[in-house]
């Protein structure tokens, strides 16, 4: 049995993904992606778009949580803004939030 199946069978975790816009004066998109990946609950973070002229970067972020999607992404936003001085704004596109299938649902 795979470890992911054991973990997911023990607790009720739900995976979500959403598009996130981050503004930063100091950090490059790859550094910001690494910082986002280090936040609790984040499983993947990929760069979707970057605009160096305005320092706005868009990421596709996948998380796993026991909370609702809105609560989990709000917590992610608070963590990013409080832990990292490099992050000036952190906006989750609420229309892009979607629930993903768990490994047992395929």
Outline where the language-model segments fall.
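Helix N-cap motif at beta-to-alpha junctions
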Residues: 25-26, 62-70
């Amino acid at each position: 049995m795979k470890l992911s199946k054991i973990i997911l069978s023990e607790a009720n975790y739900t995976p979500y993904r959403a598009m996130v816009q981050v503004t930063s004066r100091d950090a490059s998109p790859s550094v910001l992606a690494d910082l986002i990946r280090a936040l609790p609950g984040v499983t993947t973070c990929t760069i979707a778009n970057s605009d160096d002229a305005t320092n706005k970067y868009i990421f596709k972020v996948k998380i796993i949580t026991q909370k609702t999607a809105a609560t989990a992404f709000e917590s992610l936003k608070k963590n990013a803004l409080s832990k990292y001085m490099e992050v000036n704004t952190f906006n989750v596109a609420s229309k892009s939030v979607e629930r993903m299938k768990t490994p047992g649902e395929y």
